[in-house]
Amino acid sequence: MKMHQLRYIVEIVNQNLNVTEAANALYTSQPGISKQVRLLEDELGLEIFERHGKHIKSITPAGKKIISIARELLVKAQGIRAVADEYTRPNHGVLRIATTNTQARYMLPSVIERFSKKYPDVSLHIHQGSPTQIHDALMSGEVDLAITTEAPYLFDDLVQIPCYWWNRAVIVSPEHPLAKVKELTIEELGKYPLVTYTFGFTGVSDLDYAFNSAGILPNIVFTATDADVIKTYVRLGLGVGIMASMAHTALDTDLVLIDASHLFRPSMTNIAFKHSTFLRNYMYDFMEYFSPHLTRSVVEKAERLRDNNSVKKLFEGIELETK
């Protein structure tokens, strides 16, 4: 059993069982991957994948367990390299972060500017996506840290550290009837077609809770993962926008921002990472730059805790900022 064989079977799963795409991602050949997977299966005496002809159709029950362990082994191997780099090249490396468009566009620029000045030899890679995509990128080892804003239940098996609260706001054109409303109500908002985040109405979200509590079925006409796209379609008159208030800037003079903090419960932005992740010194610094209360000592305490309920208790005495 060799590490590259484990890397191959994990990447096949990452690429939705497409061996050709796995080969492309790993810069190797499809026949080479297929041969190594077969050699691994022969060594183990079982099949990891179910096949139909030459094509992989699914993962066997044993294969699912093997791939889960393989992922952890690859993370640990990556951790060994990180430990070595920490001692031999402490200010060199890579930091890979998965987050939403809103965080990448409106919250991270100042953090990255400060970070890059201190660590010019650390390459930063930002992966943008939905909560599910962010979770999958973290679990597959594509990224080191995840900055999450929705669906915290997806990250229950990971270290999840609270950063700050954020509120939603409503945006409309100056000519829209809601632009003249003194205090917006959920009933009034429910009368109009809505444009909001793609995952804003999946699962038990704060938006779900607000509308369900009022007995209102919202008319969602368009969804997007990008706040800038939401603003574009509001400008086109498609509907009333609901987005993070931080996404409204001084450049959006043609849009009226209406406070909705009294309509929807605030949401939490968290930083998440795997329990098995070896955090480099520059990763601790990044977290503190992003959220000043996340000093190294605080993060290390959170790392030692084995469940997120304990992590929440750790932060009970800390008043988190609201954005």
Swiss-Prot record:
* Family matches, as InterPro entries: CysB_PBP2, LysR_subst-bd, Tscrpt_reg_HTH_LysR, WH-like_DNA-bd_sf, WH_DNA-bd_sf
Q: Enumerate the Gene Ontology biological process terms.
A: cysteine biosynthetic process; regulation of DNA-templated transcription
List residues annotated as DNA-binding: 19-38
Q: Which UniProt keywords apply?
A: Activator, Amino-acid biosynthesis, Cysteine biosynthesis, Cytoplasm, DNA-binding, Transcription, Transcription regulation
Instruction: Cite the HTH lysR-type domain residue spans from the record.
Output: 1-60
Where in this chain does the entry annotate a coiled-coil region? none
Write out the annotated subcellular location: Cytoplasm
Q: Name one Pfam family in it.
A: HTH_1
Q: Which cysteines are joined by disulfide bonds?
A: none
The GO terms this record gives for MF are: DNA-binding transcription factor activity; transcription cis-regulatory region binding
Q: Transcription among the record's keywords?
A: yes
For this protein, the record's SUPFAM superfamilies field holds:
Periplasmic binding protein-like II, Winged helix' DNA-binding domain
Single GO cellular component annotation? Answer: cytoplasm
Q: How is the subunit organization of this protein annotated in UniProt?
A: Homotetramer.
Family, per entry? Belongs to the LysR transcriptional regulatory family.
Q: What does this protein do?
A: This protein is a positive regulator of gene expression for the cysteine regulon. The inducer for CysB is N-acetylserine.
Q: What protein is this chain from?
A: HTH-type transcriptional regulator CysB
Gene that encodes the chain:
cysB
